[in-house]
Structure formats: structure tokens, C-alpha cells
Amino acid sequence: MSTQTRSGGGGGGRNKSKASKENKENAGMDEQPQPQLQQQKGNATVNSGGGEKQKKGIDNSGSKGGDSKDKQHQQTTTHTIKTKQPTAEQIRIAQITDIKSGMDDPKIQEKIQKLMETTQRSEEEVCCALQECDNDLDRAVIFLLETLPVGAFATTSKKKKNKSQNKEQNDSATGDGDWDNGGNVGSGSGGGGGLSADSKDRRGNRPGNQRSGGGPGGPGSRGGRGGFRDGERGGDRDRNGFDRGGRGPRGRDGRDGGPGRGSYGGGSRGGRGGGPRVGTRGPGMRESNRAPRITDHQEIDVWDSVATPSANDLNKPEESSAFADTWGDWDNEEYTGSLSDTKVFTPSTQVAATTPPAQQQQQQPTSSSTQSQPTSQPQQPTTPQPVQSQIAPVQPATVSSSVTSLEQQILNPLQPKETDLVQQYSTTVVSSTATAAAAATVQYPDLHSAPSAAQHLRQALEMPQINNSSSSLSAEQSQYFNTLSSQNSNLQSSVVNSYQQSSVQYPTSYGSSSTYSDQVTSSQQAPTARRQRARVPPPSKIPSSAVEMPGDSLNNIGYLDVQFGGLDFGTDDTFDSVPVTDKFNTNSLEQSTPSSVQLPSAVQPTQSEVNDYQSKPSVVNNLQQKSSLTSSLQSTQILPGQSDALTATQSDSLSNSYSQRNTSTVVPSSVSSGVNVNSINSTTSTLEQLTKTDPYSQSTGTNAGSGGYQNVSYSTSQANKTSSYPSSAAPQGYNNSSYSSTQVSTNTYPASSNNYSSYNQSGVNSYQQPSSNVSSSVVPNNNSTSSVGVSTVNQSNPNLPVNNNVSNNSSSNTNTGYLSSQYPVSQTSSAFPSQQSYQNSSQNVYGNTGLNSNTGYSGSTSTSSGQYSNFSSSKLKDTPVSTQFDSVSSSTVSNNNSANNNSVSSSSSSLPNSSVVSTTSMSSPSLGLTNTKVTNSTAKSSSSSGTGVVPNIPMVSPYIQPGVPFYQQPLYSYEDLQMLQQRMSHVPGYYDMNYQTPTSLGAAGVRDANLGSVAYSTMSDGRFTRTDNNSSPVSNVPSTMSQQTGSGGPMLNLPYAYFYGGNVMPGGFQYGTPAVYPPQPMATNATSGGQFQKPAYNSGYGTSGYDTLSQSGQDYNKNPYPSSGVGQQSKGQTVSNQQSAGGSGSDIAPSMYGKSHVALNKVNSYEKQSFHSGTPPPYNIAGTQTAGATSGQPYGQHLYIPQIPTHHNINMHQAMHQDSNSSGQRPQSNSQGKTATKQGYSPSYWTGQN
């Protein structure tokens, strides 16, 4: 199905005969299928000639010819065929193929998705299988698993698909032909065989032979396969920087197994055509041989026809050397190709392609902008074809029939058409307003073109039941579409006219496939959307926008399906009132316009009138809804991911609401669909999507039948549902959609209902009372239709004065009366609007976006009013039915827009401007819509970007903010990877405390100077010195305690951040730490030194004792750890204390070890004996000497020792220390020996550490 695009392109690309190539190039991809057929069939010689030329020495030219063709083809297929326009013939073929394949049929898409999931095959293969098996899933599965080789399309998956479809279509015109029909030398060989061969070639020798198949097709194959390959491989060529085109030639030469192979290796770059040359290369060798390839030509034909022989070969080659290349090509090309060529199969563009080629051309550019168009309709021979299939006049009936059931159910087709016409007009009108112009251009295209695709995407995402794309597209994909849609919307403005024409062309069909009608209009854009879809295929790999994707998946699916405000929901969080208002207004407008009331009488006339844009009700309905959608789309486009998905769902969800939904769903794609849905169906469809209930869909279908009027009555029931639904979807309700739906409901709801509804809406809106007010401002639009009136009432109700009006309005029947009431109501709204303004301001408050929109929209509103007036007059003139109502509406609208709307702009601030614009556009259903479009667009843009984006950003911000604070924690955490900050207190803190401890211990005064400065030495000596000092201060001297506490605590913080890693790697950070601590220890040392020990230790430590360090050092050196630990300690105990001062410098390390024990022993003896049990905590946290000092000393030891082997022992000892606790093995007795109490405990403790 998706293969067609590929095959068309592929075939054309590969017809290598130069003449053929030129023809193709000239004809463009459009004519490629025929040239292939001709060349393959009639021009067999030419093909071989072409192939031969390539082989013969025109390898480059052949190859290049293929390449140039390929490149073009590649661009067209892999990229969006930017430069090629489908010919009428191609379009027809595409239409036929698409219709045949039912590519747009949601059911087909679902099948494709299921098959892809079940068989884990590529979409191309799955589509091929479905095509072969008449869309029978079971047969297709069997076919895929048993008949179709795994790598059948590996090299040329995308195009191959095309081939099969083309062939199946007898579109052998695509050189590729069906891979199954590969036997078909003309198309099959060239294309089909080539195809098979292609995959084979990639895979292995046979592929080359298979290519031979291409060989006979040589030209054809070249055209088809080569084209395919060039398309697919062409990318590789480009990637590789050499003409992989050779590959194309390889396909073209087909005969040259080698070349084909070569192409594999890439060695055949350039040589593909010159099979011999390439053949010589490894690739040729790799392939069977050129000769085998030539021999295989026939085989290829046979294989293609039989598929199996080659399949076997293919399988071998796949696994063989070629296989890797195949993967490379397959991955890059397939991956990209999948995106661009045929990943998403959605009915979005399935609308009968009545759009003339000119429109297609417009589409083409659109698709050019979005490269996924060809992809979107992979089945079509060429990218243009997909457009054609969308555009084919025959399509409407067929597509309509197949999709109509779904689409009608989802969207009421009649009005969308009207909408298109209206949109046309409104586009013009909107153009008058700057905001409108931008919105209209973007909106309309979005509504039609992107929406068709995007809408389907969204529907698929949000209403998988209804949408074909539901299974196909992921949230990311939908986002991607949205992005594309957004991009396309500008391009699509040009398309709008043609779209409108299209929609006018087949109103009836339109009714059946209103969605498609829009899509027809949108078909131009749909291709774009489709292309986008094509891009969609790699959902996870290539998110269009990473940020938006989450919104789509979460918001769209989560909110969209359930609530209109999927997009708005986030907005709601952020006080999404702006999008809501925008949506609300738009929807309100649209709902009111959904004008089931007007539509009933005007709908069909409107369709005819739609062209005139005169049947305001329908037109307005469509326009308004569409405009709203468009506006919402445009705005929402800003949040394409969420908006798109939401829009699709929302659009579908509400038809009257739909406008709202569309509005709220700012997704352009959705919009097109939404627009259709917007029409009366929209409410039903919208509700349907919202509730996602078939009954709604059915109702929608019914609505489609009723043309728009039922929409009202359905709207009524739907509205009721919708109202309640929107209420449940308060955010959405908050969003225009819900509210709008409610408004529509309001219409639906009787007067009291209306009042209540309005309050419901208010309730729904309650965020949205302003929203309701916005609705009020929209009300004028609502005034246009009874629904509008009701909406107005609803809004009015939210508006203070409107209650009576609401009652009147509540009968949506009283359009004129309602308008009259509404006009006052609007005035009330106007009066109220300040209130609304206020409320909306509240909403606006969500995001000043709303207010800004308001302000911006005030101008817009005024402009809207101006336009409105114009619209009103125009509308009044145009529609008698509308006229009375509209005239009132127009006047009301104008006034409302001016005052109320402006008020509303402010008042319905959520998207007050949106509201205002919306209102304005609402006031005249037809014109109002345009205004709505404009206003909504602007408002929506603000609201969407502001509200939608802002909510996201705040979401991010909070994360970031915590992140920033926690960034330090990550510092801690980072260092705390080993230890959390909390833990840092413990183990690392334990070490950290060591730092602290050294600080507080501060290496005894002398040491502090030396060791303090030298972290390493200092830490070592510091340990000893500090330990002694610390222990005494802890037990005896508060100064030490304070030092420990102060230095330890503060230092701990730094150490955590700075030194935790250092703790682990003390050496690095440690030095800094000691330096930090020692200054503090300087003071503390004095106190600790003097106070610390029982005078003997202190004095010994301070000077005489430690001077002995050299002695200890000797011992230490002589006796590494054990000596220092045991023997040294004893010596160290006595001597170290005495010598410590003298030997502090160099002796510290050795004596430090033993003496640390001694000194530490003393320290520990006081505090640590009891404290040492808790040693681990003390290291970190212990407030007293143990925490600071002990910890510090061991840490210091670590710092010092890491260089010295004993350090390791020390580490062990630390553990042991903990284990040993008071009874340090060696230090204990030794330290005691020196200073019984002090040393005794301390040594044991420190020994444990040391």
C-alpha cells in the first residue's frame, strides 16, 4: 500500500535507458510508471540498452542517469518529492492504488499495524502481503511468514512495496512492478525482480542475480529496482559520498550480478551499471557473478513471479556478506524511508482526490515542505500519486465509502466542505486581519491539509477505534505530524483555495466523507500530513520534537481522549484559560455555528452555497469551527505535539465542541479533520472522540446525514453528553472544547438546560466561567446558530444577564430570537464581559497569554468586529436564514465583538482575544468563522504557545529548579554516589570528618603550620596531632569541641561537596581540605594542644613526643603497617608523643601511623572509647573529637597513607577499628602503655581505623 509511492518513484528512477531516463525525468515521477512499463515492455531494448549503456561503459552515465533519476526519485521517495509534481496519470494511478489498497482505510491501517506487530516485518512487506492477500489478515500473516522472504524488501523495502502495489495495480508502470510479479521482466524484472533482487542483492549473491531480474528489466529493473535502490540506496550513495548510484545501475544492469553485488559493497558505486567493472569488484564476486546475475535475470523474473527461488537465494544472501550492507542500507534508508515513505497509513488524506493536479501541485509543494508525503502514501507509485489518491475524483466515493463509515461517524462531512468554501472566504477575510490572515492561511491549510493527516493521526492516537492511524502513529509521530503540519500550514495557505474548490466539488461525497472532504481539501495538505506520517514511522527514533512528544502521548492520549483539553489540560494546570478561551471561543463560535440550527436548512444549500460562502450557517459552522480549529490549530500548532494529538482527538471528540476541540486542539491536522468534525458532525465526532463511544460515532454519522442540523439535535444529545463530558473534561471544558461542547450542548440543552448548561459550562468552565464568558463573547457567534445562541446563553449564563436570554437562547431553535436575545445577551455578555474579562483575565491569569491574547486580540477583536461587520453584512446578505439570525448575530457579534468581544477579549480573557476573535468570527457564522479563525489563530497561538508551552516549561522549570538545588546534592550525590549526603555523614562523612578532624585537630600548632598547609603531610601529622588535640578538647576543652563542631560541621559541608570524592580519593581533595581545616585547627590546636591531653601527651605531642616521629618513622619504614601498628605504636606511644613535634615533617607518615595510634589512642581513650563503638557515625557526624578528630585522623591517614602501602592497612584498620572498637589490636596496649587511659582507648580506636 505504501509501496506504491516507492514503486512509482523507483520504477521511474530506474528506467535507465537514457532516453527513458530523460523522459522520466522530464515526465517527472508522475510518468515514471509508464516509462517503466514502456521501457520494460516496449522498450526492452532501451532498458537493456540503458542497462547495457551503463554496463557498456556508460556506467557513469547509466549509473548517473539512474542516479539522477534516482536522486530525483530518491528525493521524491525518500525525501518528499519536492520537485516533482504528480502527473494526472500518476495521480490516477495513485488513486487507484490507494483506493485499491485501502491505504487510507483505518481498518487497513489497523491491519497493517497488527501485521507489523505480529510478524515483525517492515511496513512495506506487510503492505505487500496485505495487497497480495486482499487485505486478509490471516492469509497475509501466512504469506509474510511463509512466502515472503524476510529480506524481500530489505534493500528496497519502501519501493518494493510500491512495486507490489503497482504491479498489483498493473501499475507495472512503476518500473519496480510487484516483487511477486518480479517474473514480469518488464516491470517485475526491472522493478519487481529488481525489488526482490534488490533485497537479495543487498543480502547476498542471489540478490545480484535477482538484480539480474532487474537486469532483464535492467532498465526496468534499473528503473524500478535501481530507482528503488537509488532511492533507498541513493541515500547510501549520498551517505557514502560516492555514487552508490552504481547501485541503481546495478539494479539497472540487473545483469551484472557483480555490479549489483558491488552496489552492495558500495564498490559498485558507479559500477552498478558497469556491472562488469563492479562485477570485477568484490561485490560482483560477492554476487554470484555477473554472468550468474545475467543468468539470474530470468531467475529474477521467475523469482519475482515465484518469489520463492529468489527468496531462497535472498535468504542466503541476506545472511551472507551482503546482509550487513543490506542492513546498513535498510536501517538508514528503511528507517528514513519508513519515515518519509510509508510508515503511517491513515485515512486522513483518503478523501476522494477531486483536487485537480493543480491542487496536487499545491499539495506537492506542501508535501515538499513535509517530506513525509510520499511516505504518507507509500502505496502510490509516486509521491504525487498519494496526493492523487487523495485527490482522485473517483476517490471520494470509494474512500468515502470505505472511510466514510468511520469518518462520517467521526466527522460530519457535509459541513467540512462548506467549511472549506467558507474557509476560502474566511481565509480571504481573515487575510484582511493580520491575525486572521496568518491564522487563516495556516489554519485553513492546517485544518484541511495537516488536519486531515494530523487529524487522522490524532484520531488514531486518541480515538484508535475511529482513526486508521490510531494504531500506526505514536505520540511522537503525531507530534512529528504536528510539527510538519505546523510547517505545512503556511505552505498550505496557498493550497487553501484549491482545497476549497475541492471541497466544493464534491459536497455529497463530502457529506459521506466529510473528513475526507476536508481532507480532499486537505488532501493537498494531507499529503503533507501524510508525508508527515511517513515521517512518523520511526516514532521512537525520530521525535519531531522531543519536548512535545510527552505532551502528545500524555496529554493527547490522556486528556484528549477523555477531555477536550488534552492540550488545554496542561494549560489548565497553568491556567490554560488562554487556549481554553481560544478553543472555547472558537468552539463556542463553531458550536453555535455548528449551528445545527442553521445547518439544517442551510447545510446542504450551504454546501452549494459554501462555495458562495453565503450559506452562513453551514458555512459559518464550518468556517467557524474550522476557523476555530484553524485558529486553535494555528495556535495550538505552537504546541504541535499535544495540540495535534489533542486536536485530532478533540476535534473528533467534539463537532460543535469539535470546533472548540479543534480550537483547543490546536493541532492543524486535527483541525482539518476537526473542521470536518467541526461541522455539525464535529460535535458528534468530538463527543465521540471525547467519549470515544461508537454511539457518538454513529451519532456523528447521523449528523453527517443531517448535514449539520442533526448536529444540533445530535448536538443536543451529544451536547448533553458533551456538556457532561466536557464537564468531566473540565480542563477541556475549561478549554474551549468542553465549554464549547457544553455550549453546543447548551444549544442542545433547553433553555433551562442552557442556563444550567451555561453554568455547567461554567462549571465545566468553572475555570472557564470566563471561558463561558468567552463563550458569551463567542455567543454572538453562537448567536449565529441556535447552538451558538445556546452557547451564547451558556456563555451568557456565565455572563450575568444572559439567563433570560439563556432561556431563550437555550432553545437553540430561536436563532433569530435567540440572536435578539443573544444580541442583548451578547450585550449582557458585553456588559458581563468585563466580568468575563475579569474571569477570563483570571483564566488569562493562567497565562497572560490569555490577556496578552486578549490585548492582541482586542485589536483582533476590533478587527474581528470590523471583519465581523463585514462578515455580518456579507453574511446577512448571503444567507437569508443566517441573515436574520446572522444579521442579529452580526450586529450582535459586531457589537459583542467590539464591546462584548473586546470586553470578552479582555473579559473572555482566557483566550479573550481568542474569545474575542472567536466571538467576532462567531458573530457571523460564516464570517465570524473567518474572524474566529483569525482571532482564534492569534489567540490560540498565544494561548497555545503561552499556555500550552508555558505549562510545560513550568513543569520543566520546577524540575530544573529542584535540580539546581539538588545539583549540589548531585555533587553530594555524585560524590555521594558512594555515599549519600546522609551517608556522607557516615562513611564518607566519616572520611569527610577526617578532613574536618584534621581541621579541628589542625595538626598540632607546629604541624598545623606545616601539615596544615600540606594537606597530605598535614593530614598525616595532623591526624596524630589533631587526634590528640581533638580528643582532649572533646573531653576536656570545649574550644576543641567548638572547633570540631564549627570546623567539622562547616567543613563537612564543603568536604561533602568538594571532598566526598576526595574521601574516596582523599589524595586529590584532601590536600585542599587540610588546608581548609588547618587554619581552624590552628586556633584549635593551641587549645587542644594545651588543653588536650593530660599534659604529658599534649606536651609530648606538641613537641618532644612527636619529635620522635623520626624514630617512629624508622620503625614505620622498617615495619610497614604491622610494625608501625604494633611495635611502632608501642615505640610510637612513648617516643612518638615525645618526638611528634620534632619529627612532624617527614616522620609524620611513618610515625604518624604508629603515633597516630598512640596519639589517637589518647584521643580515643577519652571520648572514643565509648564513642568508638559508634565510630562510623562519629567519623561522619560525631560532634566531639571522635567525629571530627578520629574521623579526621583516620581520614588524614588515608590521605597520607594512600601513597604509603600502610594506608591500605589503615583502611582495613579503620574497618578493624570499628570492629576492634576500644580494643585496638596493636594500638590498644601500646597506646595504653604510653598513656594508659588516653592511649589505651585511643589506640584501640585508632588502631581500628589505622
UniProtKB/Swiss-Prot annotation:
UBA domain: residues covered: 107-147
Biased composition regions of type Basic and acidic residues, renumbered to the chain: 227-258, 287-300
Query: Which UniProt key words apply to this protein?
Result: Behavior, Cytoplasm, Phosphoprotein
Q: Which Gene3D superfamilies match?
A: DNA helicase RuvA subunit, C-terminal domain
Q: Where is the composition biased (Gly residues)?
A: 183-195, 211-226, 259-277
Q: Which SUPFAM superfamilies match?
A: UBA-like (SSF46934)
Kindly give the Pfam families that the UniProt entry links to this protein: UBAP2-Lig (PF12478)
Does the record bear Phosphoprotein in its keywords? Answer: yes
Write down the CDD domains for this protein, in alphabetical order: UBA_UBP2_like
Biased-composition ranges, Low complexity, are 74-87, 346-390, 507-529, 662-686, 752-821, 834-874, 887-949, 1029-1039
**InterPro entries membership:** TC-DDR_regulator, UBA-like_sf, UBAP2/Lig
What GO biological process terms are annotated to this protein in UniProt?
copulation
User: Where does it primarily localize?
Assistant: cytoplasm
Provide the protein's localization. Answer: Cytoplasm
| Residue ranges with Polar residues bias | 335-345, 650-661, 687-751, 822-833, 1105-1141, 1182-1194
Name the GO cellular-component terms. Answer: cytoplasm; nucleus
Positions of the UniProt region annotated as Disordered: 1-89, 156-400, 507-549, 586-613, 650-951, 1024-1048, 1087-1152, 1168-1199, 1216-1250
What does this gene product do?
Answer: Acts in the nervous system to mediate the control of copulatory organs during courtship.
User: PANTHER family, from UniProt?
Assistant: PROTEIN LINGERER, UBIQUITIN ASSOCIATED PROTEIN 2-LIKE/LINGERER
Q: What's the protein name? A: Protein lingerer
Q: Which organism is it from?
A: Aedes aegypti (Yellowfever mosquito)
